[in-house]
Amino acid sequence: MIEYIIGALGLIIASVQDFRSREIEDYIWIFLAVFGVLFAIYSSITLLDYSILINSISGFVICFILGYMMFLSGIGGGDGKMLIGLGALVPKFQMPIYTSLGTLLNLNYVPTFPIMVFINGIFFMVFLPFVILFRNILNGARPKTGKEFILMFFGEKMKVNVAKEQKRLIMGQNDKINFFPAADDEDFSKYSNNEEIWVTPQIPLIIPITLSYLVTPIIGDRILDFLIPF
């Protein structure tokens, strides 16, 4: 249980960092991974059960591969690193299993829990527009048109110099709004650095992952069972 609590604290801290600055400090996932392996060594020695250590190491290795694949796919690097930390910290945790996929993932030395947390987290991304809305409100964005009201859920309003640094795509300004900017919509030359424009959001995946981490011990793979019964 202590591993689960530490994992929850790490994810909450990472979520706050990601929400405020769109950056997750490396010390969080490193601490989770190191503590996970050290605690597994301690538990294996005291309980004379070395499968605990094997699970932690295999969880780290498998989640490292999955996290690297996420990075290559363009998904946030910080989110993949948190997966690595959780793989070493809580590779296994009690949760209900309803599907054949869940049964397959529940094999020995497969980090069932963190993988299911990330799978459920992807489904929880349906709530991300409300996270984006809340962040816009906190940043002082106020819609002046109907289009801007919609953008409160799907874009972010920020100064041009910040958007350039973060390599965002331009969605527009005032009534000239493009809800689906192309990859080359990053010509900021027509704006001054202090102007505020609407740009594409950087998806804070760590927030739905944190929510998933808290509820997955209760729901297991029930979402998969409901949406894709097999």
From Swiss-Prot:
Coiled coil: none annotated. It is found in: Cell membrane. Disulfide bonds: none annotated. GO terms for biological process: proteolysis. InterPro entries: Arch_preflagellin_pept, Preflagellin_Peptidase, Preflagellin_peptidase_C, Prepilin_IV_endopep_pep. One of its GO terms (molecular function) is aspartic-type endopeptidase activity. It comes from Methanococcus maripaludis (strain C6 / ATCC BAA-1332). Belongs to the peptidase A24 family. Archaeal preflagellin peptidase subfamily. This is Preflagellin peptidase. Cleaves the N-terminal leader peptide from preflagellins. One of its GO terms (cellular component) is plasma membrane. The record marks D18, D79 as: Essential for catalysis. It is a multi-pass membrane protein. Residues 19-23, 73-78, 140-204 are extracellular. Changing G78A: No effect on proteolytic activity. Residues 1, 47-49, 90-110, 217-230 are cytoplasmic. Changing G76A: Large reduction in proteolytic activity. Its EC number is 3.4.23.52. Keywords: Archaeal flagellum biogenesis, Cell membrane, Hydrolase, Membrane, Protease, Transmembrane, Transmembrane helix. It catalyses: Cleaves the signal peptide of 3 to 12 amino acids from the N-terminal of preflagellin, usually at Arg-Gly-|- or Lys-Gly-|-, to release flagellin. The chain crosses the membrane at residues 2-18, 24-46, 50-72, 79-89, 111-139, 205-216. PANTHER family: PREFLAGELLIN PEPTIDASE.
